[in-house]
Amino acid sequence: MEYRILAEFYERIEKTTSRIEMVSSLVELFKQTPKELIDKVVYLSIGKIAPEYTGLDYNFGEKLAIRALSRVLKIPALEIEKRVRQEGDLGEAGRKLYEELGFKPEGTLTVEEVYNGLLNIAKAVGIGSQERKISIFASLLKKATPLEAKYLLRTITERLRLGIGDNTILEALSIAFTGSSVNREVVERAYNLTSDLGYVAKILAEKGLEGVKQVKIQVGRPVRPMLAERMSSPILILRKLGGKCGAEYKYDGERIQAHRKGDEFYLFSRRLENITHQYPDLIEFLKEAIPHDFIVELEAVVIDPASGEIRPFQELMHRKVKYVTKYHITKYPVAGFLFDIIYLDGEDLTLKPYPERREILEKVVKRTDRIGLVPRKIVDNVEDLENFFYQAIEEGCEGLVCKSLAPNSIYQAGKRGFLWIKYKRDYKSVLADTLDLVVVGGFYGKGQRKGTFGSLLMACYDPESDMFKTVTKVGTGFTEDDFKKLEEILMPRKLNHRHPRVNSILEADMWFEPYLVLEITGAELTLSPVHTCGWGKVSPNRGIGLRFPRFTGRYRFDKRPEDATTEQEIIEMYRMQRKIRVRS
């Protein structure tokens, strides 16, 4: 299969502002793809060569790409850098240079060649690896047409800019190989259990829907985490959960999914990144505490060994290094508090109800001074829930996670729903909690910010439509250093038009690929004629907007755009806020 076909589809997708057209283009592409290549085409279409958890990265920045391009086009790197500044995009600059110089490709690029070349670049390490990477990439550029060069350059620098989401891929795969998006739920469950789009695509293409139904949990492949909705009223929480729930402490730590098979251990972050190397001590604690093959979920926190008290979340950031040494382990000792088990000795536990999973967890875990279970209390009245909430706050927690005890309280991998409800409270604001919102656009600033953005258009995520819907426009809370950092992150992801997965009434001065999640606070949620979050769901011809928004200073690099606060959460927060006003 020629790489040209992919490049042409990417160009078509980049130009559309319609998600329906994006899905349609992907369906057409997947139908044209040979079955043996479908996994590679899926990976390349999201700018990857493997799932996130493998840790395979190109480690090939723009400067290396320019060196390779300079070598192929036989022009100075400085000239290329100048064009990149003019175009604002290395890929587009490369395409135009190819055309202007009348570059003649030395052959025809295939998808296999591109994939294998990129894989070899990702695997190149050690002495001389940089030169090997440049040489491999240059060999691909030599065979590229102008359009192919554009997408090769974007791919290698991890700035593909198509913004194709997981749900969009899953929908397109379902239509392409089963004839209907109705089957997406089956395909999605297989993905939620394996976190590998390419793997699921290949099974679907080769073995059909029945093959996908046989996909099982595997130790070493992270399960996409179940997520909680949020509420700030104990009355509503109990009502939502049938009058009774299991309330658990919500620690301000790092959520980790731990896997064990014999002597093999894997630790995965909330974003499904392999972080095994960051916690060698935690692995030893788990080895002692659970003598079984397992997949468990826990919160890792830094503790004071003398008092057992939990230290601030920021101290955990010192573990985010390439090589964790004895110094890190001693200076920032961690403990793990387990809250779920989804696999035990070959058995998938995700379809068992929460009370049964908790009972299994209590039976198999040997408590130590570094491994424990998240404290839990079964509550059926507001007073008990409130008292347990205050107890959690006093012990340094963020609040509670209230869990359904019903027979249908299964582990919903990759889903956010009301089987789990976060109960947090911010007494300084009418707004019950901060929002994690995605940057989708920018507006020109004034004074020192003239010519670049001075405020950002922020959106929530709607998993039903796989769309980002606007909530607010924020320009306060940012320092000059923040603006510099934001420019570095956002400008390489600037688009010529609104992204097809962004639903916005407002016309931004510049648009960005949905990528960066920021923590935003504000005064209150109000009805809005210009924001699309909850449009028509709480009032005709109105959405929900956030008044007096402010950046808290927290960049949520641990969250993907699809992990942002959902539209439904904001609707619930708005309704809750109105009830509080009525009562007061």
Curated annotation (Swiss-Prot):
Keyword rRNA-binding: no
Binding site for ATP: E248, R255, R270, E299, F339, R416, K422
Single GO MF descriptor: ATP binding
Transmembrane segments: none
Family to which the UniProt record says this protein belongs: Belongs to the ATP-dependent DNA ligase family.
Pfam families: DNA_ligase_A_C (PF04679), DNA_ligase_A_M (PF01068), DNA_ligase_A_N (PF04675)
Family annotation (InterPro entries): ATP-dep_DNA_ligase, DNA_ligae_ATP-dep_bac/arc, DNA_ligase_ATP-dep, DNA_ligase_ATP-dep_C, DNA_ligase_ATP-dep_cent, DNA_ligase_ATP-dep_CS, DNA_ligase_ATP-dep_N, DNA_ligase_N_sf
Enzyme Commission number(s): 6.5.1.1
Name of protein: Probable DNA ligase
Biological-process GO terms, alphabetical: cell division; DNA biosynthetic process; DNA recombination; DNA repair; lagging strand elongation
Protein's UniProt keywords contain DNA damage: yes
PANTHER family, sorted: DNA LIGASE 1 (PTHR45674:SF4), DNA LIGASE 1/3 FAMILY MEMBER (PTHR45674)
PROSITE patterns: DNA_LIGASE_A1, DNA_LIGASE_A3
Organism for this UniProt entry: Aquifex aeolicus (strain VF5)
EC top class, as a word: ligase
Cofactor(s) this protein cannot do without: Mg(2+)
SUPFAM superfamilies documented for this protein: ATP-dependent DNA ligase DNA-binding domain, DNA ligase/mRNA capping enzyme, catalytic domain, Nucleic acid-binding proteins
Position of the signal peptide: none
Function: DNA ligase that seals nicks in double-stranded DNA during DNA replication, DNA recombination and DNA repair.
Catalytic-site annotation from UniProt: K250 (n6-amp-lysine intermediate)
Catalyzed reaction equations: ATP + (deoxyribonucleotide)n-3'-hydroxyl + 5'-phospho-(deoxyribonucleotide)m = (deoxyribonucleotide)n+m + AMP + diphosphate
Annotated keywords: ATP-binding, Cell cycle, Cell division, DNA damage, DNA recombination, DNA repair, DNA replication, Ligase, Magnesium, Metal-binding, Nucleotide-binding
